[in-house]
Amino acid sequence: MNGEGNLNLHVRRGVVLTAVQQRGISSPTLLLFAAIVFMVRAVMLMLGPLLVALANDFGTSIAVSGQLAAATFVTLGITAPLVGPISDTYGRRPVLLIGVLLMALGVLGSGAAWSYGSLMATRLITGVGLAMLPPTIMAALADNLPPEKLGKAVGFIHSASWVGVALGVPAIALLGYIGGWRLPFYVTGGLSLALWVMLYLSLPSGQRRLGQSIDLINRFKVIGRQSASWYVLIANATQAAALVGLMTYFAAYMIESYGWDEARTAPGLAMLGIGAVIGSFVGGFIAGRARRLEWMAAISLTSGGVTGLFFVLDAHAWIVVAVAFAASVLVSVSVPVLTTLNMSLAGQSRGTAGGMFATSNQFGGVVGASAGGLMLSLGGYTAVGLLCLVAAVLSASVVGLVMRRAPEFRQGSSLDK
């Protein structure tokens, strides 16, 4: 992956769009996929800047409101591993259409929620829709692009998802400030419905392969037999817990500790999203290095310390935001590296491996949001910082002490050059 920088340069110049169009995926379709993953990321993390308003409206604590974010990750994690085999059997188009529709209906239903319980139910529905989209989009790209061109398109889509954090989540914070917590749900749900219409009109129908069965058990056995795959999943889940903990409780921490309102958190949330974009780029570079595991272990360990520092540092508000920005850069580096390792271990079962990887992401999200809320109720934001620190240290330990010594990763070192 020594050409990582060139790939990103080509994406910015639009070459990848032309290449995709020549292989049967038009530029509008690729941009539509990018808009969908942008919306997925924004919807996934949209509760962060709304936690205080939700707690006030439903008469609960911020810690209890944080469980609404965890609910999304629960159904997302359960659904994610099923998506790959199902889309392989029934086609990408129906899975994408159902996923976008469920996302839209879940978000609109959240805006109309009349109680904490009803909002919990609609967030569960939203999670099912979210789980169906990114893995299926990646599979659709792989169906139509050769390996040498697939990476460019995947890089473009992955970047778009983090723009959902840099721009989408701050926009949600501003909408919440302007019109209350329901307005962001209505706007986001309406945009999701518009995406569904465009997807329905533009995405060509596929054909199901007759006689092909889903065969979930055997597909999972292929991955489950490899201990190395479990190391990757554990490292990813623990690092994801630190990332989601930071993203979920950043706005609430700044509102409660520094007297900010939702509008003032928007620039800070944008900085966290930009930090994640930078971290992902750095991770893509490290993924192709011979000593990627050593680098990742050191960066993961540092990310835990910086994230923990954010929740305890007593300094000027924008100094604290700068620390959060640094934390978002560091905590995001591992995702491209672990994704690369996961795919290299999967052989011919990459769809199933991708679903399991997505599940590990969501499991980490549940820990970051739900356990973060529990820690908040027990020990305040200092305890949330401690949770993020412990999660990152666990991830670094798995990478540095276990994965570095595993023969499967040493055997793959030739791919790093």
Positions of the model-derived regions?
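Juxtamembrane intracellular "pre-TM" segments in multi-pass secondary transporters
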Residues: 14-23, 203-233
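Helix-breaking motifs and short loop linkers at transmembrane-helix boundaries and internal kinks
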Residues: 59, 91, 112-118, 259, ...
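Conserved MFS/SLC helix-loop-helix module at the cytosolic interface between two early adjacent transmembrane helices
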Residues: 78-114
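Helix-to-loop junctions at the C-terminal end of transmembrane segments
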Residues: 80-91, 279-291, 376
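Cytoplasmic membrane-interface "Motif A"-like loop-to-helix N-cap segments
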Residues: 89-98, 288-300
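Cytoplasmic helix-loop-helix junction between adjacent transmembrane helices
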Residues: 122-163
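Helix-loop-helix hairpin linking two adjacent transmembrane segments in secondary transporters
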Residues: 147, 155-203, 249
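C-terminal transmembrane helical hairpin of 12-TM major facilitator-type secondary transporters
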Residues: 293-338
